[in-house]
């Protein structure tokens, strides 16, 4: 298995690394939140009777160790050390001021017995399980209402052994929605780093209703055929930084969400201030996706230095009548694509709904989406951008995009309005009007990228942006 040092070498070869001139919520380059990776108290899971043979079920050992460490929460927190070995377990809950540390060659294995993954209530912003009515199985590693939580180590592994769940999905024998590998809920101050995640039953890392989250230097792997094994899904969360990751899964690498139809509208918590940088991956779905569950709104999404290869699409926005909500102020730049079916895809009729209470008049607002500095080889189609009749997607801005496209019809656009500059092959008719100079204010941009614009000509502006 590739280690993160190898991935860093790949990034350097691609020349994608540079500290950005813009930031959203940190002083520079997604600086770490003030979290304590070093704790004054530490215990090993072996001190609580755990056996790392891959056969013994260690759920009680994890639960007892964390219960004991809770006594140090007001004393600087504590670290639970997981040494080399294969540590089979069912679901267990984290606590505040805890570092879960996996040593090199440590593997936390998810139990293949569904009884070891308890059923919990559905998320209020979804109203039911994502796959089935009713509850959902708790994630393997779970936390709720926490502060200052770290999952890290020396590139240890968390393996969900998801094939048993994928088979249930394919055979239609699920009783409840499948579990995620890691879910943190209503939590703030979260760091996940230097871990390899394998074979999630469902979405891999799911911060929901969270603030101040950093996910960096992680590898996420699942077979391309595995259903719905998204990599990282920030959901109704804010101030999220995802950087220096390699992801190869059976669904979206990153999927930004904020609730489902009327439940998400009523809950009303958006995802905002999402930074994604230095990401490499391949998928049977999208590199960076927004939706389709976006009913609480999604805004201030900034992504750069992205390499997507052997994938269905690079950028995708998914929504539908009945979703409501909005997607606005999205800025994606500096992407390299290789062997991608569709570079840019917006879908206005992604019609999955939780129940028959869906209000078809709850129309989403999709506006101010800027995509720039993109190159691609072996791309089948440049764009399939489909809005909603009577609810156009507006202020879609494309700049400095060069794609080697195989299709004779590179673009297909409907119910969309926007602008473009330096796009090859030439953008579709609704996007042909030039950005500069009249429509700069219609496009979303990072302020530092357009300062002193009034004193520049169009060529200089394009070079400096």
What is each residue range found by the language model?
Residues 2-465:
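Extracellular/periplasmic carbohydrate-active domains that bind, remodel
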């Amino acid at each position: 298995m590739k280690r993160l040092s190898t991935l860093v070498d790949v990034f350097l070869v691609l020349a994608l690394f540079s500290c950005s001139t813009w930031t959203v919520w940190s002083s520079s380059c997604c600086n770490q939140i003030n979290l304590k990776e070093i704790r004054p108290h530490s215990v090993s899971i072996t001190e609580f009777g755990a056996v790392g043979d891959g056969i013994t079920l260690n759920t009680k050992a994890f639960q007892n160790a964390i219960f004991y460490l809770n006594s140090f929460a007001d004393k600087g927190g504590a670290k639970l050390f997981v040494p080399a070995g294969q540590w089979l377990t069912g679901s267990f809950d984290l606590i505040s001021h805890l570092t879960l540390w996996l040593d090199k060659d440590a593997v936390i294995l998810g139990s293949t017995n569904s009884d070891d993954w308890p059923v919990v209530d559905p998320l209020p912003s979804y109203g039911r399980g994502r796959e089935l009515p009713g509850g959902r199985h708790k994630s393997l590693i779970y936390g709720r209402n926490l502060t200052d939580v770290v999952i890290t180590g020396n590139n240890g592994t968390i393996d969900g052994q998801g094939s048993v769940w994928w088979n249930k999905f394919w055979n239609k024998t699920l009783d409840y929605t499948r579990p995620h590998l890691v879910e943190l809920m209503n939590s703030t101050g979260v760091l996940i780093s230097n871990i390899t995640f394998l074979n999630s039953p469902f979405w891999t890392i799911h911060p929901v209703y969270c603030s101040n989250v950093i996910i960096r230097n992680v590898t996420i792997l699942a077979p391309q055929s595995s259903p719905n094994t998204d990599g990282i899904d920030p959901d109704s969360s804010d101030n999220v930084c995802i950087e220096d990751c390699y992801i190869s899964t059976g669904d979206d690498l990153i999927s930004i969400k904020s609730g489902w139809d009327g439940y998400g509208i009523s809950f009303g918590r958006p995802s905002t201030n999402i930074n994604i940088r230095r990401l490499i991956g391949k998928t049977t779905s999208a590199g960076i996706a927004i939706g389709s569950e976006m009913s609480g709104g999604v805004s201030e999404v900034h992504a750069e230095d992205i390499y997507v290869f052997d994938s269905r699409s690079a950028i995708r926005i998914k929504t539908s009548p009945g979703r409501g909500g909005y997607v606005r102020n999205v800025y994606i730049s500096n992407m390299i694509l290789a062997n991608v079916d569709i570079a840019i895809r917006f879908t206005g009729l992604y019609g999955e709904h939780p129940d028959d209470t869906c209000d078809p008049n709850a129309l989403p607002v999709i506006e101010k989406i800027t995509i720039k500095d993109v190159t691609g080889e072996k791309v089948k189609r440049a764009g399939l951008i489909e809005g909603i009749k009577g609810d156009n997607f507006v202020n879609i801005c494309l700049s400095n995009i060069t794609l080697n496209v195989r299709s004779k019809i590179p673009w297909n656009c409907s119910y969309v309005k926007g602008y473009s500059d330096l796009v090859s092959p030439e953008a579709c008719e609704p996007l042909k009007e030039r950005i500069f100079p009249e429509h700069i204010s219609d496009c979303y941009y990072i302020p530092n990228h357009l300062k002193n614009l009034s004193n520049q000509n169009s060529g200089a502006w394009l070079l400096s942006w």
